[in-house]
């Protein structure tokens, strides 16, 4: 019995270490993604000047995030953070969350669904087909060809930002330096997405005015910028498969949780 007790204690300690490690990994990957989103929003804000200014800002983005080290860090963080998003659903003994915790969890689960179209249309399209899409092509897609997708992208912007800000708040709330600067950080947290959304609107309006110009069309409607019909159809297919994978992962998480609860219940009856 003593050996069993010692083994059980070691398992509990190991579980505690695992939970701590997963929390640290979730925070670290979340900070990487929040940094990426912040630079992305700053770039969106440049569209308040002009679409050309936003395109110029992409050069800095590429230096940071499209070099091999930056891309590896970004996509490893994205994959890991998204995978760990299912962990609270499995780990929690019950679904009693605070309102802020529930909001962050629900928003986090919505992000992969909302972001799939954008990631496939930019990074995946570039990697697979070599299409060079910038702000002009993305504004064309979201403001002219698919306004519904454009609305969803604006919603995505807010969902990602609120999810990230809640994560930062949960991480910093017990830090002694946080209360004095919380007001300033809140102001910045409101200002940056507002500027990004305004840039999104201003850039879209500029493209609506330019889209009928033959010179603009010759520059931006080439297949190497917007892709061919076959390439775009393939991206739609990949998006469908991505949604299937997400649904399976979500279902397996709930099944694993149910099996764990069943095992605990049976052990409790012995």
Where are these regions (language model features)?
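Membrane-embedded alpha-helical bundles that constitute the cytochrome b-like, heme-associated redox core
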Residues: 1-270
């Amino acid at each position: 019995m003593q050996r069993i007790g010692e083994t059980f204690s070691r398992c509990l300690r190991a579980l505690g270490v695992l939970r701590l490690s997963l929390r640290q990994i979730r925070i670290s990957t979340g900070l990487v993604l929040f940094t990426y989103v912040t630079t992305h929003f700053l770039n969106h804000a440049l569209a308040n000047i002009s679409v050309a200014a936003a395109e110029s800002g992409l050069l800095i983005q590429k230096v940071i995030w499209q070099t091999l080290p930056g891309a590896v860090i970004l996509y490893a963080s994205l994959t890991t953070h998204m995978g760990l998003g299912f962990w609270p659903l499995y780990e929690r003994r019950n679904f009693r969350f605070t309102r802020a915790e529930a909001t962050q969890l629900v928003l986090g689960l919505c992000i992969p669904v909302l972001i799939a179209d954008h990631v496939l249309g930019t990074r995946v399209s570039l990697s697979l087909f070599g299409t060079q899409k910038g702000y002009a092509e993305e504004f064309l897609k979201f403001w002219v060809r698919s306004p519904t997708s454009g609305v969803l992208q604006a919603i995505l912007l807010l969902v990602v930002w609120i999810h990230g800000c809640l994560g930062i708040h949960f991480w910093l709330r017990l830090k002694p330096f946080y209360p004095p600067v919380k007001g300033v950080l809140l102001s910045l947290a409101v200002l940056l997405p507002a500027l990004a959304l305004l840039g999104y609107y201003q850039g879209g309006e500029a493209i609506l005015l330019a889209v009928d110009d033959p010179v603009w069309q010759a520059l931006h409607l080439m297949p190497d910028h917007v892709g061919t019909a076959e390439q775009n159809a393939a991206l739609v297919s990949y998006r469908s498969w991505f949604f299937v994978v997400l649904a399976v992962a979500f279902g397996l998480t709930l099944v694993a949780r149910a099996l764990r609860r069943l095992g605990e219940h049976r052990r409790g009856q012995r």
